[in-house]
Amino acid sequence: MVEDQSRYLESNINHNELIKLVPFMSDLPEDSIHKIAAHFVTISHPSNQVLLLENDWGGSVYFILEGWVKIRTYNLDGKEVTLNILGRGEIFGEMAAMDKMPRSTDAITLTKTLIGRIPAEDFVNLIETEPMAGVHLVQLMAKRLRQVNRRLQLREASSISRVADAILFLVEGQGTEGDKGGTEIPNLPHREISSLSGLARETVTRVLTKLEKKGLIQRNADSMRIPDLPALEETIC
């Protein structure tokens, strides 16, 4: 299994403090945090590292401490389909832990990434014994269902709407305030926005150029800045 084959060393950072940086864990009682920390492992991965493979059995649940992770599958034609792009503070691998079924997707890093993980049985025990953890899990499932519904509703929308929605999707998960105002996200490769929006990469490139010319986005090598989020939202119809 991929999750057991990492060649990267465990970090020595204080695990209690790292766990509190994850929204899912942030307001749990201290005794629950201590129990999680006892089996919490942190591992650094380079970009394009496969973390999990579809049909693997779920031995761990993962928390992103730094970086970006793509959750993907493949359609019947063998084409890659990006289901989600997760960033700092987000969680993955929880479904296989809860239903004790093989994993339904792959997970691969998009950037240098620091991952924390706990054994699946510890996660399940946390959900069963800590009410707030159960509430957080329901909220997480509801959020992801809303995101899927939104993307399905836009399947027949214009290419500009779909690319704008993909950008806003990333902003919702990991947008940060820019040094010059506005909101910033990492400037991911066009192929990732292509897979997320369901459009050809060439189409995504053209749309991004149009959005940049209109002043709705600004790009450099590392980041994309959205000066006015409501203005970008207005392009979705």
Which stretches of residues belong to each language-model region?
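Cyclic nucleotide-binding regulatory module and flanking cytosolic helices
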Residues: 1-47, 96-97, 129
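Cyclic nucleotide-binding regulatory domains
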Residues: 24, 49-112
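Short aromatic/basic micro-patch
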Residues: 27, 85, 117, 187, ...
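ATP/adenylate-binding site constellation spanning eukaryotic-like Ser/Thr protein kinases
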Residues: 30, 66, 88, 112, ...
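Cyclic-nucleotide recognition modules
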Residues: 33, 84-142, 146
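Polybasic "coupling" helices that flank or enter modular domains
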Residues: 128-198
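Phosphate-/nucleic-acid-contacting segments
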Residues: 170-237
